[in-house]
Every structure is written in C-alpha cells, then in structure tokens.
Amino acid sequence: MYKKELQIGGRTLSIETGAVARQANGACVIRYGDTVVLATACYKDGVVLGDFMPLTVDYKEYTYAGGRIPGGFFKREGRPTEKEILTCRLIDRPLRPSFTKGYRQDTQIIGLVLSADGENDPDILAINAASTALVISEIPFPNPISAVRIGYIDGQIVINPTNAQRDLSDLDLVVAGTPDAIVMVEAGAREVDESVVLDAFEAAHNEIRRLCAMQLELRAEAGKPKLEVTYTPKFTADLVTELMGQHGATLKDAMQTKGKHERSHALKALKTQILGAVAPEDTERLAATHAAWAEMEVQIFRDLMLKEKKRVDGRSFTEIRPITIETNVLPRTHGSAIFTRGETQALVTVTLGTPQEAQKIEDFEGETFQRFMLHYNFPPFSVGEVKFMRGPARREIGHGNLARRALAPMLPPQEEFAYTIRIVSDILESNGSSSMASVCGGSLAMMQAGVPLRSAVAGVAMGLVTGEHAGDVAILSDIAGMEDHEGDMDFKVAGTRKGITALQMDIKVAGLPREIMARALAQAKDGRIHILDKMDAAISTHSAELSEYAPRLYTIQIPKDRIRDVIGSGGKTIRWIVEETGTKIDVADDGKVTIASNDVTSANRAIDIIKGLTASAEIGTNYKGTVKRIEPYGAFVEIMPGQDGLLHISEMAHGRVGQVTDVMQIGDEVEVQVVGIEPDSGKIRLSRKPLLPPPTEEEAAAAARAPRRDGPGGGSDRGGRGGFGGDRDRGPRRDSGGGRGGSGDRGPRRDHDRPRHSSGPRPHEGDRGPRFNSDSGAREASDAGMPPKTGGGDEGGNS
C-alpha cells in the first residue's frame, strides 16, 4: 500500500492506493477527518468513433456512510439523488478536457462515499480521488486536477470549511485546477464583492498546487505506465489554407449572418457546397475536408474577435442583447414572467405552497426539507430539434441548481414568509445563457407573485477568446451559443447591485492572470446592472397582495405541552380539523402552527378551533356558548372552539326543570359559568344558576310544593327516576366512593331474592344511580359528573 498525507485547512488529508479495488485500472481511498471516499478509474479496449470523449462519471453516497438505513420500502439506495448528480457534474467538468488529445476509449470513473462525518463534504474529496485514480492508472491523463472549497467568514478566507462553518460563511466556493491554472469554479454567495472572489481564487490555487504535488508524488511511487496515444489530425494545414483561399470570404460572410437559424442555414449550405466538390469515392478527402471545415470556423471566429474586434452578431464586446420583459402572463399561476434576451427566452412561473409541501431530502446525514425549489426544463423545440422528452438530464439539473443558488440568498426568512416556493423555468428559445435567463425570470416572477425578495437578482454569461500573444484577449458580455462553443471560457455571474450571489466557470485555456479575471468580473457587473435596470423598469418591488389563487398562510403559537391536544390520538384531532375546515395545517415542534387556506372564513374557523383546543377553561369564569347536543340529563355546550362542557339539567334553573328542551334547543346561545373541571379527564361542568337572578320567596315556595316525578322509586326523596332514558333530576353523584365497581358505601342490595337480570319493575333502587352499558362507563360518569360514552358517542366534557 502507498500512502501520502497533507495538512490542509487544519486537518489531515490522506490518499492511499494498493489496498482495495486492485482490479481497477486505478483506485485510491481519500480520507479527511472521518469522511472516506473510494474512487476508481477503468477503461475499455477499442477506440470509439467520433469527436467526443466517451467518459462516464458515477458518484454514490451510501447511507451506511452516516450510520443510517435508507427510508422507503426497499431499504436500499435507488436512483441518483440530485446531490449525487450535481457531484457527478462537479467531477466531470474539470476532468473531461484534461485527457491526452486523441484518447477516445470508453472510460468510467466511480466515486463511493464509504464514511461521512457530517463535517467534511465528500464532493471535493471525490474530485481529488477521481483525479488520483486516473493519474496512477494506465489511462492517458497527464496532469492532476485538485479541488478545494473556500469559505468567507467574518472577513477571513477559510480553506475547506466544515459544514457548520459553511452555514456561517458568506461564500461557498469550489475551485478545481491544475498546478498552472484554475479550470472550474462553482459558487454560491451572499452578495460578496468581486474583490473577495478574486482573493478566494488565489487562495484556492495555492492549495490546489500542494494537492497536485501530492498526487504526482503518489504516481512516482505507485503509477502504472501510460497508454500510448498517437494523435493524427484528419486534415493538413495545406488543406485548410487551400479551402480558406477558396471559401474563406464566403465563410466569413455566412458566419456574420444575423439570426441564429439564418446563420446556421448559411453555414450549412456552404459546408454542403464544399463537401459536394469532393468525389464521393474519395472518403479520405471527405473526412479531411469535414475536419478542415471545423478548423476554418475556429480561425475565422477568432480573427473576427481578435483582429477586427467584431462579434458574429455585430455587437460590441460589452453589449447586452435586446431585452423584453412581460409579467403576470398566465392567469392561474401565482406568479409568472417571460424574460427574453436576444434569441433566448424563458417562461418562469412561481407556485406558493404550504410548509408541508417542502422537498424532502434524504441522505447519509438524515432527512432535511428544502423550502425553495427551482426546476429548469430545456425542451427540444427551444433549439428547433426533435428528441424524446424524458426526465430531466444532468445538464438541466445543474442549470436549475445554479439558478436556485443565485436566488436563494435573497429570499425572506421563513419566519417572515413561511411559504414553500417552487419556480419552474421552461426555456422556450435558446441561443446561449438560458440559465441566467432563468435567474432573471425567476426574480421577476417572484416579485410579481408577492414574494418579498430582499433585492432583485440578474445574471449574465461572460465569454473569453484568447490569441497566441498575451495581449490578444477579448472578454465578451452576454455570450450567444456560437461564442460559448468556440470561445475559451464560459463564466456565468449572477447577483444584485450590491454583490455576487452565484458563479459558475469552465475554462478551456491554461492560465488566466488575475488581471483578466478582474476585468471579466467588472464587465460582468456592468452587464448585470444594465439588466437590473431593465428589470426594475418592469417591476421594481414585490406585489402588495398575493395571487387570489395562492393559499393564505396564518401562523399562531401554542404552548409546546398542548401540541398533543391539537394532534390528538393517532392524528385524529388534526384530521378532524382539516376535514371540518378544508384547510392545511402544519404543527412544528416548537408549537408554531401554520394554517393554509384560500378561504379566510375557513382559516379563521381552524384558528378558533386550535385556540379553543389549547386554551384552558377557568373555574368561575363566564362563557357564552352554543348548545351542541341535548341528552335527557343535560346539554353539552361548546364554550370555546373544540371544547364543551356538561350543563346538567339540575344546573339550568333554580327551580325544577321537567325536560331540557323546555329550557333550550340545539343551536341556542347560552351564558354559563364553569363550576368544575375534572383533574384527570379535564371534563368541564357548567351551570347557569350563578348567572340567574336569585329566586323570589314565592318562586322558592312554589318549587318546594311542586309535585315530584312519579316513578318506580316510590317515596325516594330524590323523586322518580323516569325509567331508562327518562328524565332524571339526580344531579352529579356525590364524592362518596366512586362508581358501581368502586369501594363506595352503597349498601347491600335491598331485594336479595330478585334475579340479577329481572325484566320486571325495580321498586327498591333507592339512591343508586342509573345502570349503564358497562361498569367502566358508570365509574367514569360518577367520577366526572357526566354521562359515560355509549354506542360510540362522545359524552365527555371536551370534544
């Protein structure tokens, strides 16, 4: 086994090879803290036809790396997550251009996260491990690529910040490069200044050189001999010179044709003419002419830029294409905008949802929820092509993530705007910089939707064309498709007037001095301000009102110890509230309750119910309630939403009440006073007597003379019982020992000879209370002074 170590960011980074995955062409294990990543590199014999590099990159974060079992039914990892796809792109972008020219064999790189400590993100480790696996293998990958992450905390640059530090950082920058140059940049930021970004580039490159040196040391000890690759151009310089002499002027005119499709048709017609002049049987000459055509395009494109200072569409180097903006273009969406810049057009929509609709993300660190999503779609018609429309490709996921990172820092805190936000950007036309159009359209659509952004965000794609001499440099603002394809840099910059919020850069040339990078960033800022001026002219602040079709969110705070009262057993109570009111309800662990509804009345009803469930009735307090249910022994009165109590028939008036319905009906509003609350069950006893005028002497005497009910109880001083279900004027049971099954002093049964289940009259019931369906029901009624639950009903004091 071979091993190398390096101190970086205050921690030890080690790379080792030779112990595991020994049948791969190249394999290494990288460790940083307790995060461990295995990377392998393999190739297949046989040259693949075509002009592309047949490279496949796969990256997997096993949940066992964090000591977890995957969720879901199958309990194993499935298709790649968005984080894994983005990391694949992060590995692929710097490595793909770095293979020896002419190498065209199927190559696969696999990165596996074997252990994760939750502090060191494995993405940059995977880049370093993948490069090391290639460097020590037979695969012709001559120069190592290394990567670091840069943070910016309290005005200080931090190398490889931990995840906890990243939460505090104003900059989250990943930089990859060779010992000589930076080749790839990916960043999100909180409105940082361009000078901070330049300093971060410099600090990153210093660490990259050290990491590359470590890879070269490992190759010197454990590297395998490289495959021999012979690159033979399909064309000769003489052929290019010949064709340029014959068709150069025509090609130059065709390249400067206005309009993407018009230019494409002109170039295609000229190419067909040139190839048609070659005899069909001369296949070698045909292949050489085809290759020479591509070289001619490159030469004329660069000559226009560097010698004539012209762009193919006639713009100056700093000029932004014409911009048109429309907002509120779709009637039913919560927010919408069409942003058009030249021949690139994005239809961007915003949908507002409840906190429950946030995106659930599961990885080796556990479950998290993402409240802001941006989905980017690139249908084939946007470039006039015919293709199958399947799920989003890696490119679409990458572009959507870049646009999301650009907008996310400007969102209001969740405490101020609790909505889940989903943006969808559908590219309707594309001629370069569609991801930056998505940023602009997303900012406009959120403003129109009423999202209180801290500031508008715009983005612009910068390009670069370099010549043979150091001074031959053209920095291009708002590049179009051909400039992206033929140029030396694709540098996307998004931000506000104050600073940068997102960066993405891929460089095809070796070594860009700080001065050129500074000029590119300054020119990008000028372009960004120009675009923001256009956006502000269309909509300068967020709408005062949300769309009528957007849900309204209402937030209340309840005591944490009352959350269970809102949820109920198995979620029964909250489901009832949702069904009763037609709202959506989310209860957080801290007691924050969010109610979502399009109807204000329904939302207020849900709020009242929740407040009622979590409020506490107080003994001696008067309440105005509504009669919800009537039983022979009393009425159940709702004194607060979701809470009711028993108003016994004996507590309805000072005098004797024959039937409950003589006094009140269902739906009546009555004023009552809480006279008792059972400590165990929380059931509430109500009375009207304290609120009624005291009886006159005549009324009291009349009540005393009133005949008692006739019943089988005979001369009992409690009056007749009225039979099962009849009227009873019994009042609550005294605290004399509980219910039937308790140890109360009930006395012996008076009729010892009567059968237990006699169906005849029961003349000697005495002072025993009614029989219920079960002993437990009787005990509950006795303890609470209320009827027990019978037949599945709920006769308790609280609903």
Regions found by a protein language model. Give the residues of each.
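Mobile "lid/hinge" segments at catalytic clefts and subdomain interfaces of large enzymes
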Residues: E138-K258, M446-A544
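Short flexible coil/turn linkers enriched for glycine and charged/polar residues
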Residues: I8-R11, A21-A24, Y32-V36, V47-M53, ...
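Conserved phosphate/anionic-ligand binding catalytic regions in large, soluble enzymes, centered on
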Residues: G26-C28, V36, N120-E138, T327-V350, ...
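Single-stranded RNA-binding regions, centering on S1/OB-family and related RNA-binding modules
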Residues: Y549-P551, K560-S799
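Long, basic N-terminal domains or extensions that often function
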Residues: M1-Y231, Q273
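Glycine-rich, flexible beta-strand/loop modules in the N-terminal catalytic cores of phosphate-handling
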Residues: A24-Q108, V113-N120, P179, E186, ...
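Short, hydrophobic beta-strand segments
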Residues: G111-V113, V183-G188, V229-K234, G245-A254, ...
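Extended amphipathic alpha-helical scaffolds
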Residues: M1-K44, V48-L49, T230-G366, P551-D565, ...
